[in-house]
């Protein structure tokens, strides 16, 4: 996002890191894409993203390019990142989905979808992007950072403390402190999803 904002002449700077990989995964529906073999099979299909123009769509574009597809070769559909995304692929309203956990883990555990591309692991992410791809972070306009150094430092300190805690916490400890809605009614799925994403979390900001 900081790079795209620069192109719009809105200078932004990221100042502390939460995710060192996008933590997004692309899956295809086992209902509408039973004969899926390769990325090019998605041509003309409906691909669910968290929202149009979101980071999930940007990552999808990178992945699809590996299969020789451009942004106009598929129809991107905004489906959110929770229960709506799960129901849309189960009902066949979309053919593929790029999303986060616990959505991805739910679909894979229940056999609703097949994993096609995974950026929840640093090495796999680097293979798609040709290098590191920092993801979740705090960023702000350069002018705000220059005028509010103490606020920026306080935010940085808080995220670093959270990063350090997450790097050592057990999945069970994490589940105890997140809102109940994040568990999507299945604590075990949430725990599995967190463990699957641990590698992508920055340990130190």
Where are these regions (language model features)?
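Short, solvent-exposed loop/beta-turn-alpha elements that line the ligand-binding surface or hinge
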Residues: 34, 38, 120-131, 198-205
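Conserved, function-defining micro-sites of small-solute handling proteins
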Residues: 91, 103, 139, 147
């Amino acid at each position: 996002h900081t790079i795209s904002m620069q192109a719009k002449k809105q200078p932004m700077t990221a100042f502390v890191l939460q995710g060192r990989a996008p933590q997004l995964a692309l899956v295809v529906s086992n209902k509408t894409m039973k004969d899926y073999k390769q990325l090019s099979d998605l041509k003309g299909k409906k691909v669910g993203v968290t929202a149009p123009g979101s980071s999930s769509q940007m990552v999808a574009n990178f992945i699809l390019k590996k299969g020789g597809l451009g942004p106009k070769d598929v129809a991107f559909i905004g489906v959110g990142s929770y229960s709506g995304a799960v129901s849309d692929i189960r009902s066949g309203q979309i053919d593929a989905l790029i999303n986060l956990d616990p959505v991805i883990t739910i679909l894979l555990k229940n056999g609703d979808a097949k994993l096609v591309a995974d950026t929840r692991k640093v090495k796999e992410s680097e293979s798609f992007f040709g290098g590191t791809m920092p993801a979740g972070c705090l960023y702000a306009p350069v002018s705000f950072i220059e005028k509010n150094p103490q606020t920026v430092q306080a935010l940085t300190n808080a995220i670093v403390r959270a990063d350090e805690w997450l790097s050592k916490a057990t999945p069970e400890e994490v589940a105890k402190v997140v809102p109940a809605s994040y568990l999507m009614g299945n604590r075990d799925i949430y725990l599995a999803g967190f463990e699957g994403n641990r590698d992508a979390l920055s340990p130190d900001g």
